[in-house]
Regions:
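Conserved phosphate-binding catalytic cores of ATP/NTP-utilizing and phosphoryl-transfer enzymes
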Residues: 81-111
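Adenine-nucleotide phosphate-binding core of ATP-dependent small-molecule kinases
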Residues: 27, 163-194
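Short beta-strand-loop/turn "lid" adjacent to the catalytic site in phosphate-handling enzymes
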Residues: 43-92, 128-132, 137-140, 168-183
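Glycine-rich phosphate-binding loop plus the immediately following alpha-helix
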Residues: 98-107, 132-174
Length: 194
């Protein structure tokens, strides 16, 4: 059976066709295109669908998915196989989906899930199947935008991975600060959570 997995994030809409526990095709859109999703459903004969949405709710899409597929919603349908002191009503669908995937793949292990999107999120699943929410920090684009918005002479850049810790110009200074800053942040969280 073919499954359609839809992730409506803050920056992109990601769609994946899933069959036999494998992703067989992926699509990425800058914004929600319901007609494209309907075309994908028809072309690939989708039977089941799941929606993760951390952006504005789209009831039209949910109605279509409920009408044309066996529809799964994280907020309404999920039976959480893990315990949590954190209020799961506050957890975004994206974080919930990732922690459930970590539970499915590594049920007896401690797992740190790092998701790099609009924001960077850190979530833990213990070997005793307890969910422990970690931090949320600005993602790459958000960091670059906040620098350019807050500093008159620093413009937005399209960053590349720095070749060195020593800058040769303003662009490379921003790349070092932002990209290597994220890298060290992640290493720091990994170290703290060990």
């Amino acid at each position: 059976m073919r499954n359609l997995l839809i992730d409506i994030g803050n920056s992109f809409v990601k769609v994946a066709l899933h069959e036999d526990r494998k992703v067989i095709k992926e699509f990425k859109f800058d914004d929600l295109k319901i007609d494209e999703i309907v075309n994908i459903m028809k072309k690939y004969k989708v039977v089941n669908s799941a929606l993760s949405n951390v952006s504005n709710p789209n009831h039209e899409l949910e109605i279509i998915l409920k009408d044309q597929t066996s529809f799964f919603s994280f907020k309404n349908d999920v039976k959480i196989p893990i315990n949590s002191p954190y209020s799961l009503k506050e957890v975004g669908d994206d974080r919930l989906a990732l922690i459930l995937a970590a539970h499915d793949e590594f049920p007896n292990d401690n797992v740190l899930v790092v998701d790099m999107g609009t924001c960077i999120t850190y979530d833990l699943k213990s070997s005793s199947n307890e969910y422990k929410a970690g931090g949320i920090s600005p993602g790459l684009k958000m960091r670059i935008k906040s620098i350019s918005d807050g500093a008159f002479k620093l413009k937005e850049i399209n960053p590349e991975y720095p070749k060195s810790y020593i800058a040769s110009d303003t662009k490379s200074s921003l790349e070092i600060g932002v990209i290597l800053g994220i890298q060290h942040e992640i290493k720091g969280f990994i170290s703290e959570y060990r």
